[in-house]
């Protein structure tokens, strides 16, 4: 049909989802979808109308508008479809094609009534009218489905639903509103009412055919329902007694006890199992669980106490009987909490809800067993045929009702026996409004689950007969097995905990005595020392195995607790390599870093668990890579495409709770002395506090260890601070060129206790736990691990972990706003409070004492700054020759070097701008330079990868009067292969210099040009003589040692970071945490910028270093050229920023290099040494130190370095008062040997240990550290420790074992803290237990720190130094980990 037909009848109202057509006013007044304004304005022309008509008729589904008429004039209130008829107003071509078989020849659909004129099938008319009424009631569209024969209009039979004879129609009926139509449309014979109108309801309809593939599931459901209906009909009608007999036989033969009651709880049927177990046939009695279940006070209940009770009103008489209790099967006498089963049963009867409980039922032999008792209500309607007997329906399966209703349903089951042959799919399910031959779930209000009222009860013509079908399933064996499993898990955990302690105790003795023996017996031969080393290696391997087993057990029990802290990702990579560097060195394995330092900022995560995974992977690569192989280790930010599935409370922030600071008053009063003993006061506060240096250490959830007698913690004053940021992932990788993994061994690679080669002749050992633990840890950390491998060529392992990326600019702004709200403080605190220092502005240098790569360059001697000449950068010809046969190493080092060149250039330009503008460096901003390969030929520092053009470069530079500034970075393998070529090239340079010198003499020039040429060998060896006394930079090559080497040995970088600008640099660094006003007003800053500062210790080498840069030539200020291939001295030495910064004081306990510290290594070269005694007033010195204590001694004092470029210390806490530092963040006095610890840090020490072996180890350790044996007190239990303190003398430190007889360590600590809350000793827990709960127990009892055995001597020394620092101020340490 065309849209233009019957224009007077077309009145389609358009809303947001329909089309409105209104042709009453104009023939052109048609509309397109969504263009109502154009339609109302009558702007459509005939062409557009025709186009709309064509589109409407081309739609491949039935579509149109129809009106519903109420023939009974009931205002659409009657629900009977016989009182209604509908007329098609407008329909498309598809509608006509689908219904034309029912129409008279030449008759269309539009304008005709469905029943009176078109004679459509009755079931079709009824279905459409009922759904129109539904849409009218709900005031929204309804969806329904119905079947139809392809070739006729007969009513579909259910047998043909899924045959080829049937097509299914999916239809939508949408109520559009009411319209007024002429009365003659309804009654055409009436001519008197031509002007009268009647209301009709207008609907928009669509109908489309659904493919049969979508009904496979419905076909199975229909088949199942048909079978179920057949079974129910046979039971209802009782047509075959044999079937009923067989059915009852099934009930009698199943192992469950089956019973049936009426809606009052009266038993109608019990099967044989019920009778056999309970010994009584309870048919005809009211079900009383109290009489057949266990009773706490009366085990011999009378089972027949209700036998004579046949009154329905008395069905609750026994509800007050003594109720049974739930008892564990493995106990001899039940004593658990009593439960009133009868009350629960009567409640289920009343509310018509499922009854399900575990009940301990007593057999006729007196045995008690656990049964799962389940009962479901079943409703069978009586269809008004009183003569027909109601069958007693009995269910034969335990979970029979689960088929019809889910476990959480509060409804009951109804079987409607209306034999209706027109099943319809309503909302994609086979159903219809109040027409249904399938079971329907109704709620307690007699409503269907779809919200409509159930017609069974609403009509009042049917009576409901409710039956309760129940089963009792014996679960005693399962419950007993579950208890056994739980007990086994507990026993396993206890066994592991006990074995951990028992294995660590002798292992601690082995490692302790061996360590003491190897370090305190100089008369040992080399073979004996090698034997000690072998013992230590075996003990370490055994310790790793014990730790792996413990980790695996904790992972299996989900007891791993992630301890989040703030760290640099590059720190994890470097630490992991450091752990295995000695093993790699033995096999001459090149470990190459692929790290972009300026792209990896601080993150928050579990530092040590991530490092554990990476260490396992590197360890495998070292093990399976042949000698002279290569291992690549790297990290980067992973940009995931799919959101993480890990649960978290926020996606853009983390919430950290900070306890109240009860001890703030102690912080500001102990910062005025510049001695070592109070440089750590900032870390002694037991609770976190916020200051303008950042965040001090706070508590971390379960690590609140100080005893409640120290502080009564008030939860109401806790602060919850939101740290902005986002979650993301880090990608780590370890790539080697080892033996690879064969295909047959890959599937078991991550299995526990397995290797790809598990044969008895396998070449490589190992427990097979490392990768299994790594797999589970990465999953626990929100990531995963995977690998690629090719046999004989190597393997590459990658893993992802989820971390939190703090938003540092936002954090800094929040600190700044908080500082602006604080009141003005006294003058001496201006530096600490004027402006906050952002977290990432505290930059660390690898030249610190914690570094494993240090510069040990003996030819570098410090000069007085005032005597240091200024280098003209424009007069330098600076080249770095990177010579290596390993292209991967060249690419990695080139990236770093180009980054430093770019930073130096930016810094140089910035300094030039400041000098030109005559401004003071009072403010600075930290910039981040992306690490890219800089190939600009105009830059002043260039990188070359061969020496072929060195003669041309040197000759050109010398002829132009420039100074040669060459640094040769030569890998050892390249040196071994091309040493002659390198020597020849440097001899050529020397000859060119000599020729130029002779020409200068002829020209009578007084000043000779001084050149700077250095050789740095990248090697595993420490011997400089092998390489012609060159500087040695030990492999693996790290970021900061290489940077320090370049900055120290190239004049270009020295000219930029010259100590001549030391005052400007310091002022620049301070400006990040000091306002301009405080800089100008603080006398201490003025004194500092006037260079009234002496640095007695420029620490160039650290005692803890493993990798050194060695140069044995001590030539400073020499004016005569030496043999170039042997001489690497520079005539004018300027300090690199990293070296300069190591002398600054800090409150960080990791560094004790202080201004005017008399205990440091003597160094006769001081900065402005002649001004060292200008300030005779100690207060001025103290003020200077006070101000400098706000800065990290390892900071890089230049603005060219981004916060991400130096990441070498242990992971600092995120806003340091939010979280704890977890390990050894205490002063490491590397300027004194371990043997001097007792002399410099004298303490009265008590050892509380019941093991004589451990007492001996502790005694040897302490005497080795310099403590006198006669001053060490030994006790064997906690009570003796308490008695000694109370009756003899107080001690400074107690090394407290956790497990001791009589009184254990935790109990003894608690008593000591109660007795001496403020003057007690510093207690260090020494225990062989390694579980988190053991650590928490120690810390919560009041111990100051916790160390797991075996304890190493250097770690013990660190803790004793910490104790001395605290005891020297007569304070008690209340922090778990400082």
UniProtKB/Swiss-Prot annotation:
Residues 298-337, 663-696, 1103-1119, 1136-1187 have a biased composition (Low complexity). The modification Phosphohistidine is found at residue 501. Its EC number is 2.7.13.3. Residues 498-805 form the Histidine kinase domain. One of its GO terms (molecular function) is phosphorelay sensor kinase activity. Keywords: ATP-binding, Coiled coil, Kinase, Nucleotide-binding, Phosphoprotein, Transducer, Transferase, Two-component regulatory system. Pfam families: HATPase_c, HisKA, PAS_8, Response_reg. The modification 4-aspartylphosphate is found at residue 1297. Activation probably requires transfer of a phosphate group between a histidine in the kinase core (transmitter) domain and an aspartate of the receiver domain. The keyword Translocase does not apply. Residues 697-714 have a biased composition (Basic residues). The keyword Kinase applies. Residues 1244-1364 form the Response regulatory domain. Residues 1188-1206 have a biased composition (Polar residues). GO terms for biological process: phosphorelay signal transduction system. Acts as a receptor histidine kinase for a signal transduction pathway. This protein undergoes an ATP-dependent autophosphorylation at a conserved histidine residue in the kinase core, and a phosphoryl group is then transferred to a conserved aspartate residue in the receiver domain. This is Hybrid signal transduction histidine kinase H. It comes from Dictyostelium discoideum (Social amoeba).
């Amino acid at each position: 049909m065309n849209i233009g037909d019957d224009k007077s009848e077309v009145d389609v109202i358009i809303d947001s989802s329909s089309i409105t057509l209104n042709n009453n006013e104009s023939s052109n007044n048609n509309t397109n979808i969504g263009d109502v304004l154009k339609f109302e304005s009558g702007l459509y022309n005939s062409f557009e109308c025709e186009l709309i008509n064509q589109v409407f008729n081309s739609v491949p589904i039935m579509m149109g508008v129809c009106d519903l008429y109420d023939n009974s004039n009931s205002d659409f209130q009657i629900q009977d479809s016989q009182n209604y008829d509908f007329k098609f107003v407008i329909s498309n071509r598809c509608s006509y094609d689908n219904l034309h078989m029912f129409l008279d020849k030449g008759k269309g659909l539009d304008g005709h009534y469905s029943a009176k004129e078109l004679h459509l099938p009755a079931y079709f008319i009824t279905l459409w009218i009922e759904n129109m009424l539904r849409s009218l009631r709900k005031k929204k569209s309804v969806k329904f489905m119905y079947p139809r024969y392809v070739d006729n209009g007969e009513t579909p039979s259910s047998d043909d639903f899924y045959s080829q004879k049937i097509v299914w129609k999916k239809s939508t009926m949408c109520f559009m509103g009411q319209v007024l139509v002429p009365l003659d449309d309804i009654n055409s014979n009436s001519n008197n009412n031509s002007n009268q109108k009647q209301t009709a309801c207008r609907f928009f309809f669509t109908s489309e055919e659904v493919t049969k593939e979508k009904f496979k599931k419905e076909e199975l459901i229909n088949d199942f329902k048909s079978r179920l209906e057949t079974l129910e009909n046979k039971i209802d009608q009782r047509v075959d007694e044999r079937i009923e007999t067989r059915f009852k036989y099934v009930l009698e033969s199943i192992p469950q006890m089956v019973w049936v009651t009426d809606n009052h709880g009266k038993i109608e049927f019990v099967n044989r199992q019920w009778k056999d177990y309970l010994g009584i046939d309870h048919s005809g009695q009211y079900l009383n669980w109290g009489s057949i279940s266990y009773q706490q006070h009366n085990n011999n209940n009378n089972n027949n106490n209700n036998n004579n009770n046949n009154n329905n009103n008395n069905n609750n008489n026994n509800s007050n009987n003594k109720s049974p209790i739930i008892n564990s099967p493995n106990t001899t006498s039940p004593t658990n909490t009593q439960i009133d089963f009868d009350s629960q049963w009567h409640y289920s009867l009343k509310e018509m809800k499922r009854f399900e409980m575990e009940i301990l039922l007593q057999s006729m032999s007196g045995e008690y067993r656990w049964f799962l008792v389940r009962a479901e209500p079943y409703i069978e309607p009586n269809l008004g045929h009183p003569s027909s007997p109601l069958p007693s329906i009995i269910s034969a399966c335990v979970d029979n009702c689960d088929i019809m209703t889910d476990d959480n349903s509060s409804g009951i089951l109804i079987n409607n026996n209306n034999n209706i042959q027109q099943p319809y799919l309503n909302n994609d399910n086979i159903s219809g409004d109040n027409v249904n031959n399938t079971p329907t779930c109704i709620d307690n209000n007699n409503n269907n689950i779809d919200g409509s009222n159930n017609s069974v009860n609403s009509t009042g013509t049917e009576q409901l007969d409710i039956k309760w079908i129940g089963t009792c399933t014996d679960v005693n064996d399962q419950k007993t097995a579950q208890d056994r499993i739980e007990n086994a898990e507990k026993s396993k955990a206890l066994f592991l905990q006990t074995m951990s302690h028992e294995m660590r105790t002798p292992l601690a003795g082995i490692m302790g005595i061996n360590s003491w023996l190897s370090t305190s017996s100089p008369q040992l031969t080399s073979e004996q020392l090698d034997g000690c080393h072998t013992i230590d290696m075996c003990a370490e391997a055994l310790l790793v195995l014990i730790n792996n087993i413990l980790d695996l057990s904790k992972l299996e029990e989900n007891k791993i607790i992630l301890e989040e802290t703030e760290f640099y990702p590059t720190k994890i990579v470097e630490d992991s390599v450091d752990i295995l560097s000695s093993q790699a060195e033995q096999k001459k394995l090149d470990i190459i870093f692929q790290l972009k330092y300026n792209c990896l900022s601080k993150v928050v995560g579990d530092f040590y668990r991530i490092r554990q995974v990476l260490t396992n992977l590197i360890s495998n690569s070292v093990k399976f890579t042949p000698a002279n192989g290569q291992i690549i280790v790297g990290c980067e930010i992973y940009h995931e495409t799919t959101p993480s599935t890990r649960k978290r409370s926020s996606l853009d922030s983390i919430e950290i709770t900070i306890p109240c600071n009860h001890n703030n008053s102690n912080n500001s009063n102990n910062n005025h002395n510049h001695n070592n003993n109070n440089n750590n006061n900032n870390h002694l506060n037991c609770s976190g506090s916020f200051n303008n240096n950042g965040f001090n250490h706070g508590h971390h959830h379960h690590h609140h260890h100080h005893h409640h007698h120290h502080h009564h913690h008030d939860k109401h004053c806790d602060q919850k601070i939101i740290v902005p940021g986002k979650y993301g992932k880090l990608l780590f990788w370890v790539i080697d060129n080892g033996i690879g993994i064969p295909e047959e061994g890959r599937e078991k690679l991550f299995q526990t206790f397995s290797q790809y080669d598990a044969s008895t002749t396998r070449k490589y050992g190992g427990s097979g736990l490392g990768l299994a633990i790594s797999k589970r840890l990465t999953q626990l950390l929100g990531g995963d691990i995977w690998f690629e491998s090719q046999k004989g060529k190597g393997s590459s392992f990658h893993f992802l972990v989820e971390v939190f990326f703090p938003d540092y600019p936002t954090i800094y702004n929040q600190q700044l706003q908080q500082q602006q709200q604080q009141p003005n403080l006294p003058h001496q605190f201006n530096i600490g409070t004027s402006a906050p220092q952002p977290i990432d502005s505290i930059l660390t240098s690898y030249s610190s004492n914690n570094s494993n790569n240090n510069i040990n360059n003996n030819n570098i001697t410090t000069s007085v700054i005032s005597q240091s000449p200024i280098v003209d950068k424009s007069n330098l010809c600076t080249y770095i020759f990177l010579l290596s046969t390993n292209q991967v190493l060249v690419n990695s080092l080139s990236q770093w070097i180009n980054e430093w060149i770019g930073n130096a250039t930016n810094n140089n330009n910035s300094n030039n701008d400041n000098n030109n503008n005559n401004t003071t460096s009072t403010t600075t901003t930290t910039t981040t330079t992306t690490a890219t390969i800089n190939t600009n030929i105009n830059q002043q520092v260039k990188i070359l990868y061969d020496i072929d053009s060195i003669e041309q470069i040197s000759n050109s530079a010398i002829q132009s009067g420039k100074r040669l500034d060459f640094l040769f970075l030569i890998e050892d393998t390249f040196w071994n292969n091309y040493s002659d070529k390198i020597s020849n090239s440097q001899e050529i340079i020397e000859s060119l210099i000599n020729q130029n010198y002779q020409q200068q003499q002829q020209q009578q020039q007084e000043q000779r040009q001084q050149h700077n040429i250095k050789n740095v060998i990248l090697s595993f060896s420490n011997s400089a003589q092998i390489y012609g006394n060159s500087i040695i930079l030990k492999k693996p090559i790290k970021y900061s040692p290489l940077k320090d080497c370049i900055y120290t040995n190239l004049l270009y970088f020295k000219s930029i970071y010259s100590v001549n600008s030391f005052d400007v640099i310091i002022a620049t660094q301070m400006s990040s945490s000091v306002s301009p006003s405080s800089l100008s007003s603080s006398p201490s800053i003025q004194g500092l910028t006037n260079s009234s500062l002496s640095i007695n210790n420029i620490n160039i080498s650290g005692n803890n270093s493993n990798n050194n840069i060695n140069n044995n030539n001590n030539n400073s200020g020499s004016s005569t050229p030496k043999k170039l291939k042997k001489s690497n001295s520079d005539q004018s030495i300027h300090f690199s920023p990293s070296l300069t910064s190591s002398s600054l004081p800090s409150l960080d306990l990791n560094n004790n290099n202080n201004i005017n510290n008399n205990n440091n290594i003597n160094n006769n070269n001081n900065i402005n040494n002649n001004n060292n005694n200008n300030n005779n007033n100690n207060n001025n010195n103290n003020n200077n130190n006070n101000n400098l204590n706000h800065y990290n001694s390892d900071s890089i004092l230049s603005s060219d370095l981004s916060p991400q470029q130096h990441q070498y210390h242990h992971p600092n806490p995120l806003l340091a008062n939010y979280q704890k530092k977890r390990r050894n963040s205490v002063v490491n006095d590397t300027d004194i040997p371990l043997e001097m610890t007792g002399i410099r840090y004298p303490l009265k020490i008590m050892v509380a240990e019941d093991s004589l072996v451990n007492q001996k180890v502790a005694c040897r350790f302490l005497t080795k550290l310099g403590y006198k044996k006669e001053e060490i007190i030994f006790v064997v239990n906690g009570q003796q420790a308490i008695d000694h303190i109370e009756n003899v003398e107080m001690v400074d430190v107690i090394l407290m074992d956790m497990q001791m007889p009589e009184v254990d360590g935790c109990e003894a600590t608690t008593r000591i803290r109660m007795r001496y809350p403020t003057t007690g000793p510093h207690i260090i827990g020494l225990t062989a237990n390694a579980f988190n709960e053991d650590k928490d127990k120690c810390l919560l009892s009041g111990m100051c720190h916790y160390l797991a055995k075996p304890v190493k001597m250097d770690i013990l020394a660190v803790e004793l130094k910490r104790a001395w620092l605290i005891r020297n101020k007569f304070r008690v340490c209340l922090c778990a980990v400082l």
